[in-house]
UniProtKB/Swiss-Prot annotation:
Keywords: Flavoprotein, FMN, Oxidoreductase, Pyridoxine biosynthesis. This is Pyridoxine/pyridoxamine 5'-phosphate oxidase. It is an enzyme of class 1 (oxidoreductase). The lineage of its organism: Bacteria, Pseudomonadati, Pseudomonadota, Gammaproteobacteria, Pseudomonadales. Its EC number is 1.4.3.5. The keyword Oxidoreductase applies. Gene3D superfamilies: Electron Transport, Fmn-binding Protein, Chain A. The keyword Oxidoreductase applies. It holds the Pfam family PNPOx_N. Belongs to the pyridoxamine 5'-phosphate oxidase family. Catalyzes the oxidation of either pyridoxine 5'-phosphate (PNP) or pyridoxamine 5'-phosphate (PMP) into pyridoxal 5'-phosphate (PLP). It comes from Pseudomonas fluorescens (strain ATCC BAA-477 / NRRL B-23932 / Pf-5). Pathway: Cofactor metabolism; pyridoxal 5'-phosphate salvage; pyridoxal 5'-phosphate from pyridoxamine 5'-phosphate: step 1/1; Cofactor metabolism; pyridoxal 5'-phosphate salvage; pyridoxal 5'-phosphate from pyridoxine 5'-phosphate: step 1/1. GO terms for molecular function: FMN binding; pyridoxamine phosphate oxidase activity.
Amino acid sequence: MTQSLADMRRDYTRDGLSEAQAPAEPFALFHQWFADAVKTEQPPVEANAMTVATVDTDGRPHCRILLLKGLDEQGFTFFTNYESAKGQQLAARPFAAMTFFWPTLERQVRIEGRVVKVTPQESDAYYQVRPLGSRLGAWASPQSRVIADRDELQELLKATEARFSDSQPDCPEHWGGYRLLPERIEFWQGRPSRLHDRLNYRLQGQEWVRERLAP
């Protein structure tokens, strides 16, 4: 069955974004928008879900949904297997882009910048507050590698459970966090007739420059 996509659209009428509402630096505005999303968005939407895009050595982009697990004035933190496809891509090309979309609020935030590993202490601190199943999974799963079937994954998990039957698992060396150090952050607010509000912050030296972009 062929479905027409031409008429699939919604009009955005909830709110606007003016320079008067926007602080001089982007972190305060992100904190405000993120708090709004946590209060407003309902399941299945996760306020901290984001698309993270990386690039491989051939220049081909790859993207996936991850969860934001840390935010401070340094940047935006997420965790993964360092030996995964994204980990290998970041090792070769340490730059990434993130996109948050909060449909109820009709808002989007795009973030671009350089990516660095967090300290082992930061990785361990987050690892230790994860559910036990997730901690075991970080050891069991050879992320991004080809496996025969689901049964193989279950066997790997059983072996990991047996390995740590008498002790708590430590954070694996191949697992940990990345922090995106933003060089550009764009705030997008949906508006009627596709004439959206776009406020862009770009890092120039040590200062943030704020500018409006045409929709």
